[in-house]
Amino acid sequence: MSNIDFLPISKEDLKKRNIDVLDFIIVTGDAYVDHPSFGTAIIGRVLEREGFTVGIIAQPNWNNIEDFKKLGKPKYGFLVNSGNIDSMVNHYTASKKKRHDDFYSPGGKSGYRPDRAVIVYCNKIKEAFKDSPIIIGGIEASLRRFAHYDYWDNSVRRSILEDSSADLLIYGMGEKPIVQVSNLLRYGMKIDSIKNVRGTTYIEKDISSLKDYIEIPSFEEVSTNKKSYAEAYKIQYYEQDSIRGKTLVQKHKERYVVQNPPQPPLSQEEMDEVYALPYARTYHPMYEAEGGIPAIKEVKFSITSHRGCYGSCSFCALTFHQGRVIQNRSQDSILKEANMMTNMKDFKGYIHDVGGPTANFRHRACKVQEKHGTCKNKQCVFPKACKNLIVDHKEYLSLLRKIRKIPNVKKVFIRSGIRFDYLMYDKNDEFFKELCEHHISGQLKVAPEHISDKVLNLMGKPTRNVYDSFVKKYYDINKKIHKNQFLVPYLMSSHPGSDLKAAIELAQYIKKMGYTPEQVQDFYPTPGSLSTTMYYTGINPLTEEKVYIPKDQKEKRMQRALLQFSIHDNYDLVKEALIKAHREDLIGNGPDCLIPYNKPYKKSHKKNNAKNNNNHYNKNNNYNKNKDISKKNKKNSLSKHKKRK
């Protein structure tokens, strides 16, 4: 364990630090991991740097009010988050089945946090300390700050500020706003008077004094009229910029949810300061007996080089959380962290990742953003690269080269998503070549998501021909460097716009790939994304065009089965789908057929016979030659959800 002290979690810790009353208490749905990949750790350490005392209540028993009283009543208030992932996404699959594991909990076991954790925790805190201010933040609060469609309820819910009775919501990355809010509280301002901090959302009864704002359709309108919902989302989508974004107001009965414009992005110096704070860089020792916290394994020897993403994938809500503007750390800051890792006793020579939401977006998309902000009606890389886009991997490549030269570093991997279209726009192949030569371990994971151009257009992804060109170039480079490395594509079924015809088109593409992909995921309608708005309304809010939505559970199962057509258990669904789509030409023994005429006999196999677990039956399928790909790529669905680019 680290020599750095963890933040206090008990009265005994308070005594050791001679603290009578904490300034703030963070209540979180994750186990306590003091690592900069965890929001609780960052906010706690930032407040500590500002001279505040901070305690942590991690995963309290929501059925026991005493758990919320264990550190006493804080001087300034409680800070509440659900953890690194929305609690509903953490608990349920895309088909609404309960998950049985939780990589952010002791021993990887589920059951340590409630559904809708932010709401539950806030209600319990109000019960324990009626007049104590509550500030909510993190992904769950950020993406639910307005009235929003909730997939699990299949209805439009109010702003989480209304349901939680919290006093203030900090959205996005919270370092700047939490410092401003905490200092205002220290200076004596009441929580209900803090209304002018950027990056915050609050509830107001009277907006007559508010200036320069846009009022979006009310909760009552968006919960009963899908066109109004799409209109509200479009305005929200366009105004999430710190330079040109306006204050947004949404009425909820007799009150108003008010979102101040976003905070300016952190400067490089500010980013360096945040990641240089004294983190223990591991989980609290209280979890050791339970097997630790599995989530630390992915991040312990990974380096966050930047935040933000201008890829604007429709199914990703990052625009609403980290924003489109890249905020990067200096090379010196990153190299210091890499050197520090090599001195950790369990470092084996491998740095698992140097990246961010999209690894090869290391700098701002263009110079225009610095003065005017992000473009309101245009995207940086979709449908094609903007003429102002700066396409350059030189700085990122120089950083990777420097890390490779650090003593005791054997290998530096890139596991964050690589945006392959941006890679293809670069006329200089130097980065692409060194990526293949030094930074992948036998396979590169990329996210084409689909190959039907009509679906890709709705996803905000590049066209199929861009991906095909990338695939060819990838294998050409591997041939030149005498390596036989694979590509592992992330694929998605049932996204808005995907009908059976599109799913079959994707299945035919998979057939030509020669193996059955493991990285397949049903579209998951999570709060805050453009695709979720399409899913709920049947409308593309940016174009106002109608969109086909595969909501029927049988069809969704068919679409997923088509993506793994060679698995024995999927035979009946695939056959039914092909017949329904009048594609009987794909049933038979021909080279282009997906399945044979008759369902093959399923042989019994021993449970430990890993070679035959999937029961692949297609003689024309080359999957078995590449079975090592799928075996190496079995990851939990939460990590898949996070890393799709």
Curated annotation (Swiss-Prot):
Residues 598-645 are annotated as: Disordered. The keyword Metal-binding applies. Pfam families: DUF3362 (PF11842), Radical_SAM (PF04055), Radical_SAM_N (PF08497). Residues 295-566 form the Radical SAM core domain. [4Fe-4S] cluster binds at residues 309, 313, 316. Its cofactor is [4Fe-4S] cluster. Residues 610-624 have a biased composition (Low complexity). SUPFAM superfamilies: Radical SAM enzymes. InterPro entries: Elp3/MiaA/NifB-like_rSAM, rSAM, rSAM_horseshoe, UPF0313, UPF0313_C, UPF0313_N. Transmembrane segments: none annotated. It comes from the Bacteria. Binds 1 [4Fe-4S] cluster. The cluster is coordinated with 3 cysteines and an exchangeable S-adenosyl-L-methionine. PANTHER family: UPF0313 PROTEIN YGIQ. Belongs to the UPF0313 family. This is UPF0313 protein CLB_0243. It comes from Clostridium botulinum (strain ATCC 19397 / Type A). The lineage of its organism: Bacteria, Bacillati, Bacillota, Clostridia, Eubacteriales.
